[in-house]
């Protein structure tokens, strides 16, 4: 399940995250909704990976700090750092490959 975080706690969450995914989304974005479903499937297949989401409109400073310009933007977090990012929709197989490659 994707846990929603905010600007107030995203830095602490990222710093503590060993393996995870951060999704910048917009509430009315259809591609974001689809990407949420992909991440839910991805998370079910890889239970040790943390899944976080952050609203890009309500948390613009966090988006700017990480370089997320438009939703959906996905960041792979390993060892507390963003190792890779991608904008747009992926299927579960692409998401798994993207995570492993980062």
Model segments located where?
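Non-catalytic, surface beta->alpha helical segment in thiol-disulfide oxidoreductase systems
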Residues: 75-102
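Typically the conserved alpha-helix immediately C-terminal to a functionally engaged Cys/Sec
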Residues: 33-45
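Structural micro-motif
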Residues: 66-75
